[in-house]
Amino acid sequence: MSEFRQMRRKRQQLSNEESIAILEKATAGTLALLGDEGYPYAVPISYVYHDGKLYFHSALAGHKVDAIRKCDKASFCVVEQDDVQPKKYTTFFRSVIAFGRIHIIEDEQEKLETARMLGNRYNPNDDESLQKEIESGFSRMLMIRFDIEYLTGKEAIELVRMRNAKSVNA
């Protein structure tokens, strides 16, 4: 058996390119770690995706940091779309889950570069303000790198059917 399960409903699986596009577009997701006493610990968090990796920032201490130091395996979920369809008792969803290894960045240069990358994701074109923000908080923050080992995306079967109908009618 491979380390990662294959999706059961293959027709609903998004391509790798579509999954990456969701990661590039979204601004937040849920990071899942192995928490205290073996309980899952899932925390909503902002991020930036770059070159097959996810980057996060954090305070120097806390539940998330303790969990990362204890176990480097993690998953990260982003829900791009979740449109409730009341009469159908379902939602039209599109989501992505990344599995991989998570690390606290120790190298100061890499930490600085990733802090800039994250800052530019949320406030582009304001380098002066970003530099001041980084300088004022750099010693009190961690930068975290999530190396994606497996990425899978899925959408509601209704969205698959709509897409197929459009391509037939095109």
Where is each model-derived feature located?
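Charged, gly/pro-rich active-site loop segments
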Residues: 2-11, 83-170
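A generic structural signal for nonpolar/aromatic side chains embedded in well-ordered alpha-helices
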Residues: 23, 67-68, 118
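Beta-strand-connecting loop/turn residues
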Residues: 52-53, 72, 149
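Short beta-strand segments
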Residues: 26-60, 76-77
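Short, basic/aromatic recognition patches
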Residues: 2-30
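Broad gene-expression machinery/nucleic-acid interaction feature
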Residues: 28, 42-44, 73, 93, ...
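Structural motif corresponding to alpha-helix initiation and N-cap regions
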Residues: 16, 61-62
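Helix-adjacent hinge/juxtasegments
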Residues: 57, 63-93
